[in-house]
Amino acid sequence: MTAILERRESESLWGRFCNWITSTENRLYIGWFGVLMIPTLLTATSVFIIAFIAAPPVDIDGIREPVSGSLLYGNNIISGAIIPTSAAIGLHFYPIWEAASVDEWLYNGGPYELIVLHFLLGVACYMGREWELSFRLGMRPWIAVAYSAPVAAATAVFLIYPIGQGSFSDGMPLGISGTFNFMIVFQAEHNILMHPFHMLGVAGVFGGSLFSAMHGSLVTSSLIRETTENESANEGYRFGQEEETYNIVAAHGYFGRLIFQYASFNNSRSLHFFLAAWPVVGIWFTALGISTMAFNLNGFNFNQSVVDSQGRVINTWADIINRANLGMEVMHERNAHNFPLDLAVVEAPSTNG
């Protein structure tokens, strides 16, 4: 008997790289989306940390009045932020090599644009990586779909809104107090609290929290006892066990009697789909609302909508909100504008020389 041995050609370096990138045996899955995600998120994170600690003040309004945002320039964790790119730059792409010097780049808020653009690319790739890993493992794609909600929200406040307003200086600052300032100014200029898409987002976030707490407490309260009184109930579960760890019939019966029968899910799959879909759809709507208000399609205006028989205005809560909006608007960027936009719409009378 003759044995024929064929020499296998060694796999190319590129082939081995492809197999390693797409292998689901790695401790952390990389994937083709990860090839772009890793450097972009590392860049965004590194520049954020450095700028939050040491970036010099930024001329955010383009009027030669720099605003300090870093720790070394007098801020703390609460007040510190990455200050948005200057209004003098607008929507221009502003990498370091477009500035005359690094000092000019820092003064005009170049780090903000660098961080935001790398961050958005990175989180979009993270979403793609979630889909890619699900595909490799034969799973359904809904993890990436759910993650699209926060991606859409981040894209709305960091990219779509600045595009609509004409400048990255209108983007959300990267800090705690800066986020609150963004929210207050957004309310003043766009009346977001009266926008139905924001209302749907509030229902999504608060409702999702409520449903998550209800589900977790129901499951925890209907665990199948596997331990003694002296042991933690958590010891009664073994990872990968086939049998159910809680009694869904008991949970269904409890909740059906607490509210009414049809308020309780009797299908675990439809229940968990609902738990995922409710907050995701709500945040989708909020992101869509931000994106429409970016182009000044604002919240409802019910100002002075109720009058008496003499034509006198009877104030409603809408008028109270409007008064607060005007107060917030006149206080922000107070050195950049003589009047808020709402008070400057009337043309000045022409004078004949």
From Swiss-Prot:
Record carries keyword Transferase: no
InterPro entries: D1/D2 (IPR055266), Photo_II_D1/D2_sf (IPR036854), Photo_RC_L/M (IPR000484), Photo_RC_L/M_CS (IPR055265), PSII_D1 (IPR005867)
Residues annotated as binding a quinone: 215, 264-265
Predominant place of localization: plastid
Post-translational modification remark: Tyr-161 forms a radical intermediate that is referred to as redox-active TyrZ, YZ or Y-Z.
Disulfide cysteine pairs (residue numbers): none
EC number(s) given by UniProt: 1.10.3.9
GO MF term set: chlorophyll binding; electron transporter, transferring electrons within the cyclic electron transport pathway of photosynthesis activity; iron ion binding; oxidoreductase activity, acting on diphenols and related substances as donors, oxygen as acceptor; oxygen evolving activity
Membrane topology designation: Multi-pass membrane protein
Keywords, in A-Z order: Acetylation, Calcium, Chlorophyll, Chloroplast, Chromophore, Electron transport, Herbicide resistance, Iron, Magnesium, Manganese, Membrane, Metal-binding, Oxidoreductase, Phosphoprotein, Photosynthesis, Photosystem II, Plastid, Thylakoid, Transmembrane, Transmembrane helix, Transport
Cellular component terms per the entry's GO annotation: chloroplast thylakoid membrane; photosystem II
Annotated residues for binding of chlorophyll a ChlzD1: 118
Enzyme class: oxidoreductase
Residues of the site described as Stabilizes free radical intermediate: 190
Modified residues (N-acetylthreonine): 2
Protein's UniProt keywords contain Aminoacyl-tRNA synthetase: no
Cofactor note: The D1/D2 heterodimer binds P680, chlorophylls that are the primary electron donor of PSII, and subsequent electron acceptors. It shares a non-heme iron and each subunit binds pheophytin, quinone, additional chlorophylls, carotenoids and lipids. D1 provides most of the ligands for the Mn4-Ca-O5 cluster of the oxygen-evolving complex (OEC). There is also a Cl(-1) ion associated with D1 and D2, which is required for oxygen evolution. The PSII complex binds additional chlorophylls, carotenoids and specific lipids.
Binding residues for Fe cation: 215, 272
Post-translational modification Phosphothreonine, affected residues: 2
Catalytic reaction(s) noted: 2 a plastoquinone + 4 hnu + 2 H2O = 2 a plastoquinol + O2
Positions that bind pheophytin a: 126
Pro-sequence residue ranges: 345-353
Subunit structure: PSII is composed of 1 copy each of membrane proteins PsbA, PsbB, PsbC, PsbD, PsbE, PsbF, PsbH, PsbI, PsbJ, PsbK, PsbL, PsbM, PsbT, PsbX, PsbY, PsbZ, Psb30/Ycf12, at least 3 peripheral proteins of the oxygen-evolving complex and a large number of cofactors. It forms dimeric complexes.
Further facts: 2 of the reaction center chlorophylls (ChlD1 and ChlD2) are entirely coordinated by water.
UniProt name for this protein: Photosystem II protein D1
Native source species: Aethionema grandiflorum (Persian stone-cress)
Gene assigned in the entry: psbA
